């Protein structure tokens, strides 16, 4: 039997993530579909809507949200 040569695409980490998501639980599959794809063409509509937000910007926004929530909670508990 001839071993099937792995294509270049299959070696890429994104491909590995995708195939891992296929094997994983439905929740992980959902996360994979939410992930910002490298090409907008392959993106699911929801991911395409999000793709305008760069990951770093999204992370910063999340930090700000967390911070303001903490401040609000602290002022209430006083």
Curated annotation (Swiss-Prot):
Keywords: Chromosome, Developmental protein, Differentiation, DNA-binding, Nucleosome core, Nucleus, Spermatogenesis. GO terms for biological process: cell differentiation; spermatogenesis. Residues 1-21, 31-57, 64-78 have a biased composition (Basic residues). GO terms for cellular component: nucleosome; nucleus. It is found in: Nucleus; Chromosome. The keyword Oxidoreductase does not apply. The keyword Nucleus applies. GO terms for molecular function: DNA binding. Residues 1-78 are annotated as: Disordered. This is Sperm-specific protein Phi-0. It comes from Holothuria tubulosa (Tubular sea cucumber). The lineage of its organism: Eukaryota, Metazoa, Echinodermata, Eleutherozoa, Echinozoa.
């Amino acid at each position: 039997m001839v071993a099937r040569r792995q294509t270049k695409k299959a070696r890429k980490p994104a491909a590995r993530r995708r195939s891992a998501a296929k094997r994983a639980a439905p929740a992980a599959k959902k996360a994979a579909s939410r992930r910002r794809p490298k090409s907008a063409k392959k993106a699911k509509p929801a991911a395409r809507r999000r793709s305008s937000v760069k990951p770093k910007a999204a992370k910063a926004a999340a930090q700000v949200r967390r911070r303001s929530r903490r401040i609000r909670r602290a002022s209430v508990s006083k």
